[in-house]
Amino acid sequence: MPIELNHEYFMREALKEAKKAFDKGEAPVGVVIVHGGKVIARAFNQMEMLHDPTAHAEMIAITQAADYLKSQGDEKHRGSLEKASIYVTLEPCPMCAGALVMAHCENLIYGTKDLKAGACGSLYNIVQDDRLNHRLNVIEGVLADESKFLMQDFFKTLRKEKR
């Protein structure tokens, strides 16, 4: 990773987004995308709010980041997130991992593993698959406990509400 980033700082920013999702009854996943040392996109899961199964935090943030880069006159990359780092509280699923590869994101830093749907090393490893035309650098476990506890609290609350 060429730019030295403060991974804990940016993961705390992603955790703020995850808490917004939690407060709105969404699975608490938060994302920030960093380019040139600054946050250019931030998002949280909005699947329930938007009634859209693709409205994962990563997908929303990728669109925001591409729009931001285009607004800055970065026309030649056409949505490419080269030199961008994405901070996610939960290991991305197959859909989001595929989108990160297609967006040519450089670095993925995530909090806690998703043993049931993780596609960045846990269940699959889409982001580092040699058969694809792009691979991401991956750092896992940044503020993992905070991410894990937030997710556990969400599902405990959900189970209580169903009783």
Where are the predicted features?
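Small-residue (primarily alanine) positions within well-ordered alpha-helices
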Residues: A14, A18-A21, V31, A41, ...
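Short beta->alpha transition motifs characteristic of CBS
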Residues: I40-M47
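Short loop/turn microsegments at loop-to-beta-strand junctions
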Residues: A27-V29, A84
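A short, polar/charged loop-to-alpha-helix boundary motif
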Residues: M49-I60
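Histidine-centered active-site/metal-ligand motif
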Residues: F44, H56, H134
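Short metal-coordination and nucleic-acid-contact micro-motifs, chiefly zinc-binding Cys/His arrays
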Residues: T89
